[in-house]
């Protein structure tokens, strides 16, 4: 009950291999439970070594080690953050980059607690200092772009990229880090990095991720955005698309600009929103499945051509290389030296795979931005701070409920500008297309290649995001803008086919939550407009019986709500007595047995809807002994709210539960009159 924020997902993080194979292998074989912390102790000790190359390899080994969750407690015990922090300002640029890579992985793999601990251990001081040094270095660096490209080793831009990723991860998990970001003037620095998007899109993408994080719910930072800063974002937003990575950059910048909507002048709002949704429409209009197929074929052909060329070269020059010992020695030395550079420690990523991942990530991000556009701000905790889950709050709740005409929270709404742009750019149609299962040929290609296999999960995630988007749009747009009643019935059939085409749908929790959310919104809209529903009661009961056993609270809330919507429609029809009895018994069982108050409250709401009116509903309520069951449960529900509510549920959830408690009292009184009338 209540809106939940869309989740954000990080990109795959830095994972070193290469010249530091010994350290990496030791890290991979180590366990966090050893008394001496295994490889952790040795690697941390090497961070103090006089040799820069040893320090670099130790950092790379730690970057690999922190990806193993059992190793994290040992690293925390040995104060890894305080030991790595100073290396961000090491005299060696190579050490700086690998130290930042290790901290990047630590912040990504450790989660909220580790990131908060990193802030406590003052990682932000050397991190901000390194950001500023990189900025100054970029200003003073007069090498030509071609020289920089050829050098491609331990460059300032590479260090800046790793540093921004650490900053992004920490700010995503720690409000204290965001506060430091604000106070230390980091915005100006990262915007300078963003300005390099024409020549370094990787750095610009990292900055855009970071900006999208720090601009969310951060009014203090919004004051720091000057006209120059906004112009920089605009130039990145409107830049030509030269690759899928540049398209991802534009999408992330669009998300940042949406976060800044409160400081955009009113006269420019429509133009800006139009520009944002034009880009999101372009991203969603691309066929990701076809892209996967084309890029995989291109990679196969490129590797085949390269292998043939290498074989010809070996056949031509093999004898000369064997005979020329001196040249062989030089060649060997070069190969060994080349492996010590940090860029060789990064996992090799083929250009086709990078392009494909960029498109999939852009589409996922675009869908998440649209969901955010469709959501009201979360209710403030302060708004309900004085409410308590006690009987004394009932009078206040009843007055508030009456004043709002029976609606506790304001409904979701779209601004005219967003509404117009969504429909003009055919966003609903494109989102509908994304709800289909991923291209089977693309999935098959990816499943047969280890480096491409993770893309299957990304394609499935896009489908789930599209279903959540569909939920928002169905709730917000007029039926006419969704294509009319016939289109909604077609959509219901489509969702039904998606759901029941998978016999084991209950095992796919993310998919089940997304599709049940979309179905809930769709059935609610159809019921409110008296549009006949296409799913049979038996199909809905199959969904609900599977969903109610899910560990995901959102799934359980959705299925009981779906039953409530369906039951309220059936209650007005003749010949539905047995179905209503089944629905009532199911909802009563959920009400009394589900461990979550949120689910129990939703089930009570559903009971109120189903048995509020109609002759068949009245007969069913008597036969399942609804009144006595609710009377018995009422004191239990009050007690559970009082004992379990505080600390386990948010203030807006508690407010809704108080509302359900009040309605339960009303509903029992109503059922008493029904029972008297029918039994007298």
From Swiss-Prot:
Listed Low complexity bias regions: 18-29
InterPro entries for this protein: ARM-like (IPR011989), ARM-type_fold (IPR016024), Nuclear_Import_Ribosome_Adapt (IPR052616)
Assigned keywords, A-Z: Diamond-Blackfan anemia, Disease variant, Erythrocyte maturation, Phosphoprotein, Repeat, Ribosome biogenesis
SUPFAM superfamilies reported in the protein's UniProt record: ARM repeat
Modified residues (Phosphoserine): 15, 144
Result of altering residue 446 to Y: In DBA21; severe decrease of protein levels in patient cells; results in impaired biogenesis of 60S ribosomal subunits
Pfam families to which the protein is assigned, alphabetical: HEAT_EZ
Full protein name: HEAT repeat-containing protein 3
Gene label: HEATR3
């Amino acid at each position: 009950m209540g809106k939940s924020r869309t989740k954000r997902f990080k990109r795959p993080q830095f994972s070193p291999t290469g010249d530091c194979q010994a350290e990496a292998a030791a890290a991979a074989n180590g366990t966090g439970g050893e008394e001496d912390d295994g490889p952790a102790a040795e690697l941390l000790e090497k961070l103090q070594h006089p040799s820069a190359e040893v320090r670099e390899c130790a950092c790379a080994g730690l970057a690999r080690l922190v990806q193993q969750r059992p190793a994290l407690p040992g690293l925390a015990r040995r104060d890894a953050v305080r030991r790595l922090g100073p290396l961000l300002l090491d005299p060696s640029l190579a050490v700086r980059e690998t130290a930042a890579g290790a901290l990047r992985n630590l912040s990504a793999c450790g989660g909220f607690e580790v990131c908060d601990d990193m802030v406590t251990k003052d990682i932000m001081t050397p991190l901000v200092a390194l950001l500023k040094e990189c900025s100054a270095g970029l200003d003073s660096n007069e090498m030509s772009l071609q020289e920089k490209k050829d050098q491609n080793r331990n460059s300032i831009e590479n260090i800046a990229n790793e540093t921004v990723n650490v900053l992004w991860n920490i700010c995503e998990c720690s409000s204290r880090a965001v506060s430091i970001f604000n106070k230390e003037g980091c915005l100006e620095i990262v915007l300078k990095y963003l300005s390099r998007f024409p020549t370094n899109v990787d750095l610009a993408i990292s900055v855009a991720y970071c900006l999208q994080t720090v601009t969310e719910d951060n009014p203090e930072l919004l004051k720091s955005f000057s006209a120059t800063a906004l112009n920089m974002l605009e130039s990145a937003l409107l830049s030509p698309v030269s690759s899928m990575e540049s398209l991802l950059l534009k999408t992330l910048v669009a998300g940042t600009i949406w976060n800044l909507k409160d400081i955009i002048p009113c006269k420019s709002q429509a133009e800006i929103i139009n520009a944002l949704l034009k880009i999101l429409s372009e991203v969603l209009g691309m066929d990701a499945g076809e892209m996967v197929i084309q890029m995989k074929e291109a990679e196969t052909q490129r590797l085949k051509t390269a292998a043939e060329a290498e074989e010809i070269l070996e056949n031509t020059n093999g004898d000369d290389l064997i005979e020329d010992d001196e040249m062989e020695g030089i060649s060997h030395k070069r190969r060994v030296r080349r492996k010590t550079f940090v860029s060789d420690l990064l996992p090799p990523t083929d250009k086709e795979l990078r392009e494909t991942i960029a498109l999939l990530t852009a589409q996922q991000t675009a869908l998440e931005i649209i969901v955010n556009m469709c959501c009201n701000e979360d209710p403030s905790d302060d708004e309900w701070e004085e409410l308590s889950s006690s009987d004394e709050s009932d009078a206040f709740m009843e007055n508030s409920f009456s004043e709002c005409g029976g609606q506790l929270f304001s409904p979701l709404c779209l601004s005219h500008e967003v509404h117009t742009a969504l429909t003009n750019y055919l966003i609903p149609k494109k989102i509908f297309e994304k709800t289909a299962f991923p291209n089977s040929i693309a999935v098959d290609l990816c499943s047969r290649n280890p480096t491409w296999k993770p893309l299957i999960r990304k394609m499935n995630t896009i489908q789930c995001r599209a279903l959540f988007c569909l939920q928002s749009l169905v709730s917000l747009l007029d039926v006419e803008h969704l294509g009319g009643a016939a289109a909604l019935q077609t959509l219901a059939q489509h969702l039904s086919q998606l759901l029941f085409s998978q016999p084991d749908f209950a095992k796919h929790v993310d998919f089940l939550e997304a599709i049940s959310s979309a179905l809930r919104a769709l059935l609610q809209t159809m019921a409110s407009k008296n549009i006949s529903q296409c799913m049979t009661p038996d199909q809905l009961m199959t969904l609900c019986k599977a969903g109610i056993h899910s560990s995901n609270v959102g799934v359980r809330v959705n299925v009981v709500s779906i039953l409530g919507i369906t039951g309220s429609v059936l209650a007005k029809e003749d010949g539905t007595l047995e179905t209503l009895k089944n629905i009532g018994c199911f909802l009563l069982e959920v009400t009394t047995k589900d461990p979550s108050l949120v689910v129990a409250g939703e089930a009570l709401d559903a009971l109120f809807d189903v048995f509020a009116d109609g002759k068949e509903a009245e007969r069913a309520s008597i036969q399942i002994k609804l009144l006595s069951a609710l009377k018995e449960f009422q004191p239990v529900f009050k007690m559970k709210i009082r004992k379990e509510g505080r600390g386990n549920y948010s203030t807006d959830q508690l407010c809704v539960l108080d509302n359900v408690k009040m309605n339960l009292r009303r509903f029992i009184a109503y059922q008493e009159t029904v029972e008297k009338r029918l039994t007298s």
